[in-house]
Design a protein with these regions (language model features):
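Extended hydrophobic packing segments that form well-structured cores
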Residues: 129, 160, 363-406
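Intrinsic structural disorder/low-complexity segments
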Residues: 5-8, 102-104
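A structural signal for small-residue-enriched, beta-sheet-centric alpha/beta enzyme cores
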Residues: 15-18, 32, 38, 201-207, ...
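Generic N-terminal targeting/processing segments that precede catalytic cores or assembly contacts
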Residues: 13-195, 199-201
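Flexible, glycine-rich phosphate/dinucleotide-binding loops
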Residues: 191, 252, 391
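Surface-exposed flexible segments
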Residues: 106, 258-261, 395-401
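Hydrophobic, Leu/Ile/Phe/Ala-enriched alpha-helical segments that form helix-helix packing faces
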Residues: 48, 159, 163-174, 231, ...
């Protein structure tokens, strides 16, 4: 079921998903959803597999995204051969387009021999053997710490799961139990990647195939702020005394397992840490619990209250600054500056025995800037975590706030 937020309504018209956002002036603006490169790759793969295994042409295909929304894709650039089929889906970013909007995402599905298709990790014991790789214009991972290991195509795990699920569905329909090789390619990918963070992240040769929900939600900054404001006001009206806030769903499983707290119950502030503090105070809250991944909250240690990468990215520099204060050896400092992700940097600190001290230093800086923004009008507590290392630091009253919320 599609979750509804209080400030939004969703509509479907001729296979296109729309929603209306209430603006700050109370007016409604119709906005159109887009679909991720991962959804496009899954749709193209499903169509190519269908044409290969049934021999019938397919000009439209439907897949279900992880969000629960159906993607009705038009199939383009079909090339059929005896043992393989290639086709494409055009990336449509909706009303929140990015650099990949309009790009053709191709999938080639080829009949493969059993011995050339070892089952990928996480594939399970399916009767059909599927190998997923990247071709022209899909980046290749060269640095550790990313979603995929070094050497793999930059096709993240959720798109891989989507591709596998949709192709397995076709294989079951066609009663096919052999092996398939799936290659995702983006002809414009290498050019487009120059305008992304991929070169800096150590992803070379093209773009990444991304997406966790399968859809691109159209959100202007004002629409996001309006939604945050509505949700905070709603929580206050429901009798909550503590504003539970998180930037997103990173660490969702960790928070459920460790604290029995569902991040879905918190107000998602996205990148707007400072604005959310202001709005929570305006809504009448005197307490806030901010739970967040170090990749976002480390920026707050530098006084950055909008954590979007376009506003500034000094994550490693801030980690190094905190590390210097605790005599972290120079080789480790140098290594941190070369890290792609904060997860990787935390592991370096853990390896040299300085993780706890540095995380406490960061937490003190985060609290300093949060309290400065609140200006004495609200008590703010923080839980800082990483996906791989779990809890990194928490402020003195954070656990008490969490117990009250649960």
């Amino acid at each position: 079921m599609l979750p509804l937020q209080s400030a939004m309504r969703f509509y479907m018209s001729f296979g296109t998903i729309f929603k209306t956002d209430k603006t700050a002036l109370g007016k409604e603006k119709m906005m159109r959803y887009g679909f991720t490169t991962g959804s496009c790759a899954a749709a193209a793969s499903k169509a190519a597999a269908y044409m290969l295994l049934t021999g019938r042409k397919k000009e439209n295909i439907t897949i279900q995204t992880p969000k629960g929304i159906l993607f009705h894709a038009k199939i383009l650039e079909i090339t059929r051969k005896e043992k393989e089929v290639t086709c494409a889906v055009k990336k449509d970013g909706g009303d929140d387009p990015d650099i990949t909007s309009g790009a053709l995402i191709f999938s080639t599905v080829r009949l493969a021999k059993e011995d050339e298709n070892p089952i990928e990790e996480g594939a399970g014991e399916k009767k059909v053997r599927i190998k997923i790789d990247g071709g022209m214009g899909v980046g290749r991972v060269t640095k550790p710490g990313l979603d995929q290991p070094v050497g793999n195509a930059a096709i993240n795990h959720v798109p891989r799961e989507m591709i596998r699920r949709e192709v397995e569905e076709v294989c079951a329909l066609a009663d096919y139990k052999g092996s398939l090789k799936i290659t995702i390619s983006v002809p414009e990918g290498e050019r487009l990647a120059k305008e992304t963070f991929n070169p800096r992240l150590g992803i070379v040769g093209g773009i990444s195939i991304l997406g966790t929900s399968g859809i691109v939600e159209p959100m202007s900054s004002q629409a996001l702020l309006d939604t945050i404001r509505v949700e905070l006001n709603q929580k206050k009206a429901e009798g909550y005394e503590i504003a539970a806030v998180s930037p997103g769903n990173y660490g969702l499983d960790y928070m459920k397992k460790t604290y029995h707290y569902d991040l879905d119950r918190s107000v998602k502030c996205s990148n707007f840490i400072g604005d959310t503090i202001d709005m929570a105070i305006a809504a009448g809250f005197q307490k806030m619990l901010l739970t967040g991944h170090i990749g976002k909250l480390v920026k707050v240690a530098g006084g950055i209250m909008n954590t979007h990468s376009k506003e500034g990215d000094c994550r490693m520099e801030l980690l190094v600054a905190a590390s210097v204060k605790h005599q972290v050896p120079y080789p480790v400092l140098s290594g941190i500056l070369q890290c792609v992700t904060t997860e990787e940097a935390v592991k370096k600190l853990e390896a040299c025995g300085k993780k706890e001290a540095v995380m406490q230093e960061l937490l003190s800086k985060i609290l300093f800037y949060l309290k400065k923004r609140a200006a004495g009008k609200m008590q703010i507590e923080v839980i800082l975590y990483s996906n791989d290392c779990g809890e990194l630091a928490r402020s003195p009253q954070a656990e008490a706030f969490l117990r009250e919320l649960c």
